[in-house]
Amino acid sequence: AVERQIRVKGPDAEKFTDYVITRDATKISPMRARYVILCNYKGGVLNDPILLRISEDEFWFSLSDSDIGLYLQGVNADKRFNVEIDEIDACPVQIQGPKSLALMKDLIGDHVDLDNMPFYGLAEATVGGRSCVISQSGFSGEAGYEIYLRDATKYADDMWNAVVEAGKKHSLMVIAPAHHRRIQAGI
């Protein structure tokens, strides 16, 4: 499961991100996400997070593990890139499966056009009255969404209660990360 969000923000955010990933960061539009790979100097894989481009000058590396935040800070130890690199207080909840679209519509209303949201598309929304980033993504291999709650340590209960309440009519099942689903989906 995704547990950590490492933010790269500043005037050189795109340039720095492009330097550390194997994909072309300049081709990732704001409010889109992509699967990316970070390699060491020999080409060995360090991590393979989902990268969210929140704005022109802000990226989130969405990680399940590792110290990529420290690695990124080390890459920029000489401050040649004008960026801030930090772990932010944003935590995701996944809504996955064939009922995910209907549940999400009940949860956030018509504030986001979920019917036309592309895979790896992002949108700003509120859940339980709290600021979130929504992505159409997940590792279940089925339709799904991830809700990234901002200021999660303060507002997790508000978001969680809203998700559980909206999920009642959809027979929401709360489960822990199912890593076998990711393997079955070829992710």
Language-model features, listed with the residues they occupy:
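Basic, glycine/lysine-rich polyanion-binding surfaces/domains
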Residues: A1-I187
